[in-house]
């Protein structure tokens, strides 16, 4: 869970920007999107092998 405290004399936009940066660095959004729907193990393996193939070329 990402937590951002608004500092003294800090605008809301700056605090929001810091919060978005911490969320993206922690990978929270990506993880939640990945777990949104159930994915069969066979589909996971297929995606993993396709990603490895893309990295190879």
From Swiss-Prot:
GO biological-process terms attached to the record:
translation
**Keyword Lipoprotein in annotation:** no
Q: Where are the transmembrane segments?
A: none
Cross-referenced HAMAP family, in alphabetical order? Ribosomal_bS21
Q: Which gene is the coding source of this polypeptide chain?
A: rpsU
Q: Where is the composition biased (Basic residues)?
A: 43-57
Any one GO MF term held by the record is: structural constituent of ribosome
The segments labelled Disordered in the record are 24-57
Respond yes or no to whether keyword Ribosomal protein is given for this record.
Answer: yes
| One cellular-component annotation, GO | ribonucleoprotein complex
Keywords of this entry: Ribonucleoprotein, Ribosomal protein
- From which source organism is this entry? Listeria monocytogenes serovar 1/2a (strain ATCC BAA-679 / EGD-e)
The family annotation for this protein states: Belongs to the bacterial ribosomal protein bS21 family.
Bias class Basic and acidic residues marks the residues at 31-42
- Xref: PANTHER family: MITOCHONDRIAL 28S RIBOSOMAL PROTEIN S21, SMALL RIBOSOMAL SUBUNIT PROTEIN BS21
Which NCBIfam families does its entry note? S21p
Full protein name: Small ribosomal subunit protein bS21
Q: Which domain of life is it from?
A: Bacteria
Q: What is the lineage of its organism?
A: Bacteria, Bacillati, Bacillota, Bacilli, Bacillales
């Amino acid at each position: 869970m990402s937590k951002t405290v608004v500092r003294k004399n800090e605008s809301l936009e700056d605090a929001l920007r810091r919060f978005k940066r911490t969320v993206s660095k922690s990978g929270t959004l990506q993880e939640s999107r990945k777990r949104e729907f159930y994915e069969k193990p066979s589909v996971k393996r297929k995606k993993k092998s396709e990603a490895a193939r893309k990295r190879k070329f």
